[in-house]
Amino acid sequence: MDFKQQVVTALTGVLGDSLPAEKVAQLIETPKTSDLGDYAFPTFILAKTLRKAPQQIAQDLVDQMDVAGFEKVIANGPYINFFLDKAAFSDQILKTVLTEAAKYGESDLGHGGNVPIDMSSPNIAKPISMGHLRSTVIGNSIAKILTKVGFNPIKINHLGDWGTQFGKLIVAYKKWGSEEEVKEDPITNLLKYYVKFHQEDVEHPELDDEARAWFRKLEAGDEEATQLWSWFRSESLKEFQKIYDMLGVEFDSYNGEAFYNDKMDAVVEAIESKGLLQESRGAEIVDLTAYNLNPALIKKSDGATLYMTRDLAAAMYRHDTYNFVQSLYVVGGEQREHFNQLKAVLKEMGNDWSDEIHHIPFGLITQGGKKLSTRSGRVILLEEVLNDAVKLAGAQIEAKNPDLPNREEVAKQVGIGAVIFHDLKNDRLDNFDFDLEEVVRFEGETGPYVQYTNARAQSILRKANQEVVVDDQLVVADDNAWDVLKMLSNFPAVIARASKEYEPSIVAKYALRLAKAFNKYYANSKILADDDQRNARLSLVKSVSIVLETALDLLGVQAPKEM
């Protein structure tokens, strides 16, 4: 039974044609406190049609309404407050969660439609810093949420694997590098060579000419240049993979910038054939005045193509390859103008599918309110932060539960999960402060708090040492349980909303609220008391664990059974 629909049916039964059922459903509210009921309907909208005061309308409707199936229905000023039948509600929600288990909350909103997600996208030969965390974990969580509601996400790591920097890198490697060093520690040493190049070219500007020459060779397909480029790329990817493995993130495609080298001329020709290219100071542009945007730069004065041309090629390739229903770019907010231009140029070219391209921007990670950039003159490496988080989690587990089996594995799940959860609990567009000790705390609004709550539920089930019987009447008659039950019933709507808003924080905040409600219930209930309610109480505990584990999984966070 859909309990909100029960309210809609009761209202439409007395409203007749005054208000369509869809509008009634939109107007129904959830009261802030349970003493005002479980659902409320404001009658203001009916005052004009019925020519009565809202208070009178509320009372008249209640007097005429069929209230069977509700505990009670009352007029409260201009509102009608609905109190659900707690026994029926409890039984149905718990049976649904226990029966559907990990599938609870699934839907077919997406009808299997393809959704490419451009995410993470680090630069080859440069380290993955804390700056890459957001795009990676937001993209991964959105993919999981979209899968849950019936879409088919395609996670694309659009690598920064092309550009003039590779000419510089080849020169630097040939002058100062060695194969052994690169194999031993690819990112550190390739970055070291690149930095040395920039230090040396101050005194030796001829290095820039050499770099340009090597990049031209690379563009022309020269064997040595291509072999070195390919090697730098594969060695970097091996290092990146270590971090992706730590985060539990996988990709469906690593097609980066280089993949589109042979696809850009066709884009320029297509723009030209539509009569959209204009010359401006020797460069070629598309005028976007009609969209209130700056012109899109397609070719530089030296004939070189730009990011915009490459991104146009990528967008068109993804449409042709995946026939997408949506195409997402999980990229920082500073790129907003670029993606507006991208969509506008595609639209001007006659591609109406550009309406389904969505830039998913996000805010910055800060430390002490300042942009997270460098520590002692270098970038803050994501791998170091994750390792530090694991150590902190391990120390807390050691103090709380020194005999825990698989302590090292649990420390990884908790430490890395804490970093991911902290990122995702914040509204995507907000900047947020990062303090590792706060992030890995077991109390407060943290990932470890949610994980610990789930481990507590699992511990209760182990102590009970009995199978939950789903066929019983699962009625938990307890005020503290009521808040938990209502929250469990909201989970499918939470997932649907998160999918529509591309907003993992909706799921993370829900998990925190459910954990808090369950801990209140735990503190005030004798769950393991041997009475006729024991099976129902254990079914509630098991349902909470199922939903917490599902919510954590949607965020890309693991849920250890013991902590």
Swiss-Prot record:
SUPFAM superfamilies: Anticodon-binding domain of a subclass of class I aminoacyl-tRNA synthetases (SSF47323), Arginyl-tRNA synthetase (ArgRS), N-terminal 'additional' domain (SSF55190), Nucleotidylyl transferase (SSF52374). GO terms for biological process: arginyl-tRNA aminoacylation. Pfam families: Arg_tRNA_synt_N, DALR_1, tRNA-synt_1d. It is found in: Cytoplasm. Keywords: Aminoacyl-tRNA synthetase, ATP-binding, Cytoplasm, Ligase, Nucleotide-binding, Protein biosynthesis. It is an enzyme of class 6 (ligase). Its EC number is 6.1.1.19. It catalyses: tRNA(Arg) + L-arginine + ATP = L-arginyl-tRNA(Arg) + AMP + diphosphate. InterPro entries: Arg-tRNA-ligase (IPR001278), Arg-tRNA-synth_N (IPR005148), Arg-tRNA-synth_N_sf (IPR036695), ArgRS_core (IPR035684), DALR_anticod-bd (IPR008909), Rossmann-like_a/b/a_fold (IPR014729), tRNAsynth_Ia_anticodon-bd (IPR009080). One of its GO terms (cellular component) is cytoplasm. GO terms for molecular function: arginine-tRNA ligase activity; ATP binding. A motif ('HIGH' region) lies at residues 122-132. Belongs to the class-I aminoacyl-tRNA synthetase family. PANTHER family: ARGININE--TRNA LIGASE, CYTOPLASMIC, ARGINYL-TRNA SYNTHETASE. Monomer. This is Arginine--tRNA ligase. It comes from Latilactobacillus sakei subsp. sakei (strain 23K). The gene is argS.
